[in-house]
Structure formats: structure tokens, C-alpha cells
Amino acid sequence: MSFIAADGTMALNQDVNLEMAGGWSRAFTPHSFKLKGNKELGGNKNLNYPFFTAKPFIRNRTLQIRNGGNDTGCRIKDAALQSIIQTSGIDIDLQSYQPIHEFINGKYMGVLNMREPNNKHYVYANYGWDEEDIDQFEMSPDSGYVQKCGNEDAFNRLCELSANAADPVAYNEILQLLDIDEYINYMAMEMYVGNTDWPQNNIKG
């Protein structure tokens, strides 16, 4: 992987793993994929460069190069919406975005979206927490509930408490498990932008 900054300097040059990414969007070209640092290939475990200037830099272990997902026409809808929300002052976690010109073996592929990962590595990149310190899951129609790291105890307890959320004692315990303000902001934003690939898909927590 070679990353040339806007000023023309070689900002990063190292061997990485390349992995195809996306669901339905795998059928579209250019393809979406993930880049992962790998010591075994003679590179580094991390990708040590601040690709996303809108957030403080801690480290990057993986990057997503996206073709726009289901937005295959202009390819910027998701990135534009997240950028607008990011600069709005709303308290909500989201993936930073950087447009890039992609070349593969010298062949120009077009303008794609470089994004932060939306997996366990996101937590370290934004909060400095290792995967041993978190519980992370994903849900989709194809896979159902999948525990990515940690365990499901806190999520199961949250579901139990939610059935009786009007009870003050239960609600106070919910507040210990869930950032309720950010959760409300998240739900409001998904509904406001009209995300049609959610909530039946793309659930992560």
C-alpha cells in the first residue's frame, strides 16, 4: 500500500493484507475492500498515519476503501451525510471519511471513499480501548446475532431491563449499560436521513 498525501509526499508505504468487503456492493466495480497492517508481510501491525484530520489520531489498524455501497452512482451519499453530522456538534459516533484517488498496479480506478473501520478496531482508534476491554456484536438477516469480541452478558441484561424501562430502578441500571443520549441521537439520525439499509441490516454495537 502506498498513500500519497495531497502535497505529493509519500506519507505511508508498507505491505498490507487486502480483503474484499461489502454485501450487495461486491457486485459493483471498483470493489470495496479492507486494508490491514501485517507484520508477517514485513510491514507494521498498524498504519501509522493520521488519514482522518477531523479526529485526534491514536492509531489505525485497518482501513476501509468503499465504492459507495448501494449508492453506486455518485458514491458520496453516506460519506457526505456522516461528514455533515460530524460537523453539526451532535454527540454521536461515526466513521470519518477521506476521498481518495485509487490506483491498482498503476491503473486508475476512480475516486473512492477511505473510511474508518466500523468494527472492534474503531474503539481503539477513537477511545484507546483494546478489544479485551469491550463487548462488540453485529446483527444481520443472513448471520443473525454474532458476538465479535467479549461476551453478550451486558446486551442480554439490557434487553431484559428494556422490557420494564418505565421503572426508575430498571432505568437507572439501563443508564449504566447504555449512553442513552448518544443512543437517542443515533436513532434520530438514522430515521432523519432515511437509511433504508437499516434496522433490518447493519446493526452493530
Where are these regions (language model features)?
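Phosphate-handling architecture centered on phosphoinositide signaling
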Residues: 1-186
